Amino acid sequence: YDPENRNTRKTIYDYFRDMEEGDANFNNIEIPVNEDQNSFKISLIPGHPKLSIIDDTMSKSWSETLSGDKGAIRKLNWLNQLKKENTTFDYILIDVGPSLGALNRSALLNSDYFLTPMASDIFSLLGISNIGDWIERWMNLYEAAIKTFVSKFGEEESRKFFEKYSINTDVNKTTRYIGYSIQQYSKRKF
């Protein structure tokens, strides 16, 4: 594995690295682990610890999207580009870290549904409320950005651009909370 060789992409970070360098294109994605290569019969793009570096790029994209920047809005909609390129999958599951950072926001705003893990404690209950407030705020900001984009470029040009790059124009059809899973602790004897 050579991280500088774009032909040996093995993790999701390898795709985001192009974005960090200014390219918002998620076309021609090869899945490193295909369903016929494992007993679980799933395809997988592994994560990478360096993916957190992309959060700065995404944070900048959030700000620039509010002013109608075309490249920025494409970056925020990376997940839709990924979905468009991989139409053979029934589901795409994304496991994000426990953060309200810009990368996770972009994943949540472009996911059809999401669920959260919880422990049986007060902090989990407070966290769910916090996530709900943040998501509502993000959705409002994103909707305002779409309106700014349309007023800046006009309805027809915006429609073509949104279609071409799979831009989410209605966050009310995405980002739906479907529930939680409870994590239970088990005691082990050693």
Protein language model regions, located:
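P-loop NTP-binding core
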Residues: 1-190
